[in-house]
C-alpha cells in the first residue's frame, strides 16, 4: 500500500508502475483511461470527489498528501483484498473522524448520501457503469 511519505512525493514520481503496482487500486489503474496519479489524487480521484461534496480528503487535489503528518495507508482488509497483488478487486480505505460525520444521525445520513454520490461518479469515470442509487 502507498504510505503517507509516498503520497508526499511529486506527481511525476508517484505516477509510476512501482507505486501503481503496490497500490490497492492497481487493477482499476490498469483498466481506466486515466493516469494512476489522476485516479489516486487527481481530478477523478475518490478523495477529490468527496472533497467537492464538502468532505476534505487525503489524497485529493486539494490535499495530495499528508504533508508529513500521521496518515493511515490501509489495514489488513485493504491489503488482503485490494488489487496490489494483481487480483481483480480494487479497494479504497476510508477513515472517518467523529466530529462532523459520526457524531449525529443527521451527519451520518448526510455523509452517506455524499459517499454514495461519490461512488456513483467514480464508477462512471473509471468503469463506465452507472449505479442504481
Regions found by a protein language model. Name each.
Residues 60-125:
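Active-site-adjacent mobile loop/cap segments within catalytic or ligand-binding domains
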Residues 4-68:
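Acidic, glycine-rich loop-and-strand cores that form catalytic or ligand-binding grooves
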Residues 51, 55, 120-127:
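Hydrophobic/aromatic-lined pockets within catalytic cores
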Residues 1:
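Short Gly/Thr/Asp-enriched flexible loops that form oxyanion-binding sites at enzyme active sites
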Amino acid at each position: 500500500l502507498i504510505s503517507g511519505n509516498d503520497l508526499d512525493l511529486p506527481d511525476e514520481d508517484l505516477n509510476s508502475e512501482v507505486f501503481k503496482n503496490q497500490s490497492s487500486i492497481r487493477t482499476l489503474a490498469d483498466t481506466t483511461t486515466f493516469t494512476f496519479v489522476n485516479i489516486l489524487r487527481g481530478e477523478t480521484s475518490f478523495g477529490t470527489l468527496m472533497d467537492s461534496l464538502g468532505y476534505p480528503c487525503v489524497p485529493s487535489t486539494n490535499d495530495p498528501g499528508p504533508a508529513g503528518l500521521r496518515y493511515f495507508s490501509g489495514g489488513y482488509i485493504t491489503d488482503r483484498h485490494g488489487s496490489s497483488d494483481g487480483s481483480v478487486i480494487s479497494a479504497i480505505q476510508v477513515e472517518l473522524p467523529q466530529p462532523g460525520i459520526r457524531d449525529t444521525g443527521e451527519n451520518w445520513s448526510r455523509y452517506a448520501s455524499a459517499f454514495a454520490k461519490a461512488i456513483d461518479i467514480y464508477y462512471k469515470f473509471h468503469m463506465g457503469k452507472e449505479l442504481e442509487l
